[in-house]
Regions:
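An N-terminal domain-cap segment
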Residues: 1-54, 64
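A generic structural signal for short beta-strands and their flanking turns/coil linkers
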Residues: 26, 41, 48-50, 68-72, ...
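Short helix-to-loop capping/linker segments positioned immediately adjacent to catalytic or ligand/cofactor-binding
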Residues: 29, 33, 86, 104-107, ...
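Well-ordered beta-strand positions
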Residues: 44-46, 67, 138, 148
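General beta-strand recognition
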Residues: 51-53, 73, 155
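Short, structured beta-strand-loop surface elements
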Residues: 59-118
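C-terminal edge-of-domain segments
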Residues: 111-213
Length: 213
């Protein structure tokens, strides 16, 4: 596992904490160097056990580069709170961030369909049972990659602190300070115009129920 050199106390070595962050987010930034040019592409991902699944068009430059063997790193970030301190200098944010690096494996035809089903089930559990399976043309246009979560290939950083005290910040003690929690919620689904008369399927209902809506 990689190690933090600055603020090492924020480094977390618990694999369960890494999985919790990865499972709580949907978007990461895939970074690599292709033909001497740095690329950073925000994209959806899904954790499947000890690997992360990525997919996109076979025409995507960044994915073609990593599929050809370029080293890559996926960064995932969750903003948990604004830290409002007695001074602007001491104000910050609480967050969790992870990097997972390593070689990406291009999934073959036999694995691609199953991986895409897994990807869909992570994002919208139950949806694959409500729609048709991808056809041969769609699968041929899709590049599916797997990034292993190796013991020596990930880093997790967690900032979870109260603001500095007035004494620590050299500030007056009559200035409010505290935390403003940040969270992502799933609102009520909005049907497409051509589906307005159709019932909301169980998979979509489950998304809002699990979010507390």
């Amino acid at each position: 596992m990689d190690r933090l050199r600055r603020f090492p106390e924020q480094g977390v070595t618990d694999r369960a904490a890494l999985d919790a962050l990865l499972d709580s987010q949907w978007v990461g930034v895939l970074s690599c160097v292709v033909d001497g040019r740095p690329l950073a592409v925000p994209m959806l991902y899904a954790r499947d056990g000890d690997r992360l699944l990525l997919h996109g068009s076979t025409g995507a430059g960044a994915l073609r580069g990593v599929a050809a063997g370029a080293s890559a790193v996926l960064t995932v970030f969750a903003l948990d709170a604004l830290v409002v301190a007695p001074t602007t200098f001491e104000s910050s944010v609480n967050y969790r961030s992870a990097t997972v690096r390593g070689p990406l494996e291009t999934l073959d035809d036999d694995e691609r369909g199953a991986a895409l089903d897994t990807f869909s089930e992570v994002l919208v559990p139950g949806r694959t049972g409500e729609v048709r399976a991808p056809n041969r043309k769609e699968l041929a246009a899709t590049l599916a990659l797997s990034l292993p979560i190796r013991a020596d290939g990930w880093l997790l950083k967690v900032a979870d602190d109260w603001p500095a005290t007035p004494e620590e910040a050299d500030a007056e003690d009559d200035v409010w300070s505290g935390l403003v929690p940040v969270r992502t919620v799933l609102d009520a689904p909005v049907p497409a115009p051509w589906a307005a008369a159709l019932p909301v399927p169980p998979s979509v209902q489950g998304l809002t129920r699990s979010d507390g809506a």
